[in-house]
C-alpha cells in the first residue's frame, strides 16, 4: 500500500511544506470528487469514494504534527498506542499541573486566562515539534523521538480540552 507521503509526492519527513501539502491535496481530491462520478458505473463511484476517503485520511494525518510523528514512527515499526502514558515523572507532574491550571481557569470562567494558557501550549507544541524533527533526522535518537511523540499526543488532548472550555465560556 502506498504511504501517505507517496500519495502527495512528498518525502517521508517530519518537516513538511504545509502549503504544498494542501495544494496537492486539493488537486488530488478534485480528481476523485463524487460529483465527477455521478453518471459513472457503481464500481467506479465506489472506487472514487474509497480513494477520496484515503486521501482525506492521509491529509489529516500529515497535516497534524502529532499524527504525522506517530505515522512516521509506525513506518519504522514503532506503534504508539493512544492510551500509553509517558513514564517520565517530571512530565507527568507537568501534566498534572497543567490540568489543575485548566480546571482553575474553568472554575473562574477566565476567558483571558484561557487565551494565555493556550498561547503557552502553542509554544510548548512548537518546541516539541522542533525537538521531534531534530530527533527524527538522527536515526540514533528514535527512542527520544518516540518519547516526544507521546508528549505531543498529550498536548493534543489538552488542546481539545481547551477548545471545549473556550466554547463553554463563550456561550
Curated annotation (Swiss-Prot):
Q: Does the keyword Chaperone apply?
A: yes
Q: Which Pfam families match?
A: DnaJ (PF00226), HSCB_C (PF07743)
- Read off the InterPro entries from this record: DnaJ_domain, HscB, HscB_C_sf, HscB_oligo_C, J_dom_sf
The residue range of the signal peptide is none
What highest taxon heads this organism's lineage?
Bacteria
A single GO BP term for this record reads: protein complex oligomerization
Transmembrane annotation, as ranges: none
Its quaternary organisation is: Interacts with HscA and stimulates its ATPase activity.
**Per its record, what are the GO molecular function terms?**
ATPase activator activity; protein-folding chaperone binding
* Protein purpose: Co-chaperone involved in the maturation of iron-sulfur cluster-containing proteins. Seems to help targeting proteins to be folded toward HscA.
Q: What family name appears in the similarity comment?
A: Belongs to the HscB family.
Q: In this protein, which residues make up the domain named J?
A: 3-75
One cellular component term from this protein's GO annotations in UniProt: iron-sulfur cluster transfer complex
Protein's name in the database: Co-chaperone protein HscB homolog
Write out the entry's keywords from A to Z: Chaperone
Gene name of the record: hscB
Amino acid at each position: 500500500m502506498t504511504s501517505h507521503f507517496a500519495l502527495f509526492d512528498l518525502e517521508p519527513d517530519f518537516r513538511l511544506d504545509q502549503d504544498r501539502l494542501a495544494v496537492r491535496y486539493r488537486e488530488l481530491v478534485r480528481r476523485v470528487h463524487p460529483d465527477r462520478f455521478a453518471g459513472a458505473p457503481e464500481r467506479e463511484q465506489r472506487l472514487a469514494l474509497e480513494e477520496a476517503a484515503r486521501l482525506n485520511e492521509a491529509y489529516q494525518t500529515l497535516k497534524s504534527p502529532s499524527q504525522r510523528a506517530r505515522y512516521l514512527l509506525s513506518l519504522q515499526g514503532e506503534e504508539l498506542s493512544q492510551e500509553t502514558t509517558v513514564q517520565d515523572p517530571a512530565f507527568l507532574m507537568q501534566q498534572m499541573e497543567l490540568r489543575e491550571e485548566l480546571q482553575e481557569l474553568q472554575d473562574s470562567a477566565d476567558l483571558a486566562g484561557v487565551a494565555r494558557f493556550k498561547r503557552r501550549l502553542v509554544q510548548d507544541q512548537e518546541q516539541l515539534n522542533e525537538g521531534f524533527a531534530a530527533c527524527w533526522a538522527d536515526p540514533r535518537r528514535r527512542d527520544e523521538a518516540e518519547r516526544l511523540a507521546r508528549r505531543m499526543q498529550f498536548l493534543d488532548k489538552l488542546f481539545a480540552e481547551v477548545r471545549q472550555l473556550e466554547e463553554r465560556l463563550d456561550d
